[in-house]
């Protein structure tokens, strides 16, 4: 399964493509999409068209994107949300299933703790994917999102398969969590 991870940003959007075979993760590609110093619609157009180009080049089977966090500055949060929306539009236009993860979930999946620093994420992404060099922060975050999905997708499919049995015991799966 080929997974495209996206770390959205209005100025710089990171992308990372990995392939999962069983428990093995293989690096395919990563990079950044830099938007021009232009008005908002032009920046969103660049994100939409560039993510579409990445999809056309690498043909992922599914995609994962980082959720927006609420920033101290509400305007920044809104702008980030619009950049994220442009990326999601490109993904769904290509008929990809899109999973969403918080930064906390990504850091836990990659580093093992939710309060990890960016440098720790970069280091672990390099180690997990056996990269020769340290990836840039935006590309590392995007690869981290893809790694998170590679691990989470397996767990969710196992829970989904167990859903009928869990229901008989008065339990159910909600948002990827087991609840009573």
Curated annotation (Swiss-Prot):
Keyword check for Hydrolase, yes or no: yes
User: What's the catalysed reaction?
Assistant: Endonucleolytic cleavage at a junction such as a reciprocal single-stranded crossover between two homologous DNA duplexes (Holliday junction)
State if Methyltransferase is listed as a keyword: no
Q: Where is the active site?
A: 7, 66, 138
Cofactors named for this entry = Mg(2+)
GO molecular function terms noted in the UniProt entry: crossover junction DNA endonuclease activity; DNA binding; magnesium ion binding
Record's subcellular location:
Cytoplasm
Binding residues annotated for Mg(2+) 1, in chain numbering: 7, 138
Cofactor annotation remark: Binds 2 Mg(2+) ion per subunit.
Q: What does the subunit section of this Swiss-Prot or TrEMBL entry state?
A: Homodimer which binds Holliday junction (HJ) DNA. The HJ becomes 2-fold symmetrical on binding to RuvC with unstacked arms; it has a different conformation from HJ DNA in complex with RuvA. In the full resolvosome a probable DNA-RuvA(4)-RuvB(12)-RuvC(2) complex forms which resolves the HJ.
Q: Which family does it belong to?
A: Belongs to the RuvC family.
Matching entries from HAMAP family are given as:
RuvC (MF_00034)
Q: What is this protein called in UniProt? A: Crossover junction endodeoxyribonuclease RuvC
Species the sequence originates in? Janthinobacterium sp. (strain Marseille)
């Amino acid at each position: 399964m080929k997974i495209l991870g996206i770390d959205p940003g209005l100025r710089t959007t990171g992308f990372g493509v990995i392939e999962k075979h069983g428990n093995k993760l293989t690096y395919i590609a990563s990079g950044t999409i830099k938007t021009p110093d232009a008005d908002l619609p032009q920046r969103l157009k660049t994100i939409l068209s560039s993510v579409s180009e990445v999809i056309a080049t690498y043909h992922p089977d599914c995609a994962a994107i980082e959720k927006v966090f609420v920033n101290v500055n509400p305007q920044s949060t809104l702008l980030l949300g619009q950049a994220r929306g442009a990326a999601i539009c490109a993904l769904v236009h290509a008929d990809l299933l899109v999973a969403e993860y918080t930064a906390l979930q990504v850091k836990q999946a990659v580093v093992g703790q939710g309060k990890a620093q960016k440098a720790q994420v970069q280091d672990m992404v390099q180690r997990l994917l056996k990269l020769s060099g340290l990836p840039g922060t935006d590309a590392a975050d995007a690869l981290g999102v893809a790694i998170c999905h590679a691990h989470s997708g397996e767990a969710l499919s196992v829970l989904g398969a167990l859903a009928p049995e869990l229901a008989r015991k008065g339990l159910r799966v909600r948002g990827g969590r087991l609840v009573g």
